Amino acid sequence: MSLLEAIVLGLVQGLTEFLPISSTAHLRIAPELFGWRDPGAAYSAVIQLGTVAAVLIYFRKDIVSLVAAFFRGLARREPFGTLEARLAWFVLVGTLPVGIAGLTLKKFIENEFRSLYVISGSLIVLALILLVVEKRASHQRTLADMRWKDGILIGMWQALALIPGASRSGTTLTGGLSLGLKREDAARYSFLLSIPATTLAGVFELKHLLEAETRPSAMALWVGTLVAFASGMAAIAWLLRFLRTRTTLVFVVYRVALGVLLLVLLQTGKLSPMSGVENVEVPGEPGAPPVEKQITD
């Protein structure tokens, strides 16, 4: 992988990770446009660490407050005594569905699910769901109104992000809106909920990628991750400002347009569903089945 590829993919990752348009879809499509090989789910998961760092720094005050409240509540035997403590628990509980689904269904969400047909379908279907939710939601509740049911349900929405093209931010934002949360509150919770799953996925895939016989250079990983961090910070700030005064309709239109364009290109033979995708084999086991996994979108 060249440095130009690393920069472009890092930029794509950072800008699309937090927008409800699917980072995996764009990381899969971008190489097709430039004639590059698919970087793979492992590389995508590793440079997600850059966007995780962006969330940690952007929301550092909120995160410190949540962590402090969590342990203070345990020490005082009042684990759910404050809003911050409850939100910390909601994030932990909300991470369980994607973890369980990822481990249980990993054989079904490996390389085959990176097909451009799957991605185009996910882009369109989830866009239509977001449209319906946007129109019917009350947009009145805040994070202070969240209950255990809300944390679990949004966590289940996050599990849908295992399907490439669904978009982790898109599914969790849709889940939050469906429960009546204000757009900005739904987005803030989506960002906080992303931290455990994407961190664990990135660390796991980094270990796997470093052990693989064929892998990007360390420089490509560093550059991609740093660019993802910088562009991710910008994307977070922009999205929160945007959702204070606007709806998610622009993302719905974009997703449908991109999904339809992909289908047209696939049907006309301009694109191949699995072109450029390479499997990563287990080190020391020639011919072993691929272990590349899509953890979160």
From Swiss-Prot:
<dbReference type="GO" id="GO:0009252">
    <property type="term" value="P:peptidoglycan biosynthetic process"/>
</dbReference>
<feature type="transmembrane region" description="Helical">
    <location>
        <begin position="39"/>
        <end position="59"/>
    </location>
</feature>
<keyword id="KW-0573">Peptidoglycan synthesis</keyword>
<dbReference type="GO" id="GO:0008360">
    <property type="term" value="P:regulation of cell shape"/>
</dbReference>
<protein>
    <recommendedName>
        <fullName>Undecaprenyl-diphosphatase</fullName>
        <ecNumber>3.6.1.27</ecNumber>
    </recommendedName>
</protein>
<feature type="transmembrane region" description="Helical">
    <location>
        <begin position="220"/>
        <end position="240"/>
    </location>
</feature>
<keyword id="KW-1133">Transmembrane helix</keyword>
<keyword id="KW-0133">Cell shape</keyword>
<dbReference type="InterPro" id="IPR003824">
    <property type="entry name" value="UppP"/>
</dbReference>
<dbReference type="Pfam" id="PF02673">
    <property type="entry name" value="BacA"/>
</dbReference>
<comment type="function">
    <text>Catalyzes the dephosphorylation of undecaprenyl diphosphate (UPP). Confers resistance to bacitracin.</text>
</comment>
<feature type="transmembrane region" description="Helical">
    <location>
        <begin position="85"/>
        <end position="105"/>
    </location>
</feature>
<feature type="transmembrane region" description="Helical">
    <location>
        <begin position="151"/>
        <end position="171"/>
    </location>
</feature>
<dbReference type="GO" id="GO:0005886">
    <property type="term" value="C:plasma membrane"/>
</dbReference>
<keyword id="KW-0472">Membrane</keyword>
<feature type="transmembrane region" description="Helical">
    <location>
        <begin position="113"/>
        <end position="133"/>
    </location>
</feature>
<keyword id="KW-1003">Cell membrane</keyword>
<keyword id="KW-0961">Cell wall biogenesis/degradation</keyword>
<dbReference type="GO" id="GO:0050380">
    <property type="term" value="F:undecaprenyl-diphosphatase activity"/>
</dbReference>
<keyword id="KW-0378">Hydrolase</keyword>
<feature type="transmembrane region" description="Helical">
    <location>
        <begin position="249"/>
        <end position="269"/>
    </location>
</feature>
<keyword id="KW-0046">Antibiotic resistance</keyword>
<comment type="similarity">
    <text>Belongs to the UppP family.</text>
</comment>
<dbReference type="GO" id="GO:0046677">
    <property type="term" value="P:response to antibiotic"/>
</dbReference>
<keyword id="KW-0812">Transmembrane</keyword>
<keyword id="KW-0997">Cell inner membrane</keyword>
<dbReference type="GO" id="GO:0071555">
    <property type="term" value="P:cell wall organization"/>
</dbReference>
<feature type="transmembrane region" description="Helical">
    <location>
        <begin position="190"/>
        <end position="210"/>
    </location>
</feature>
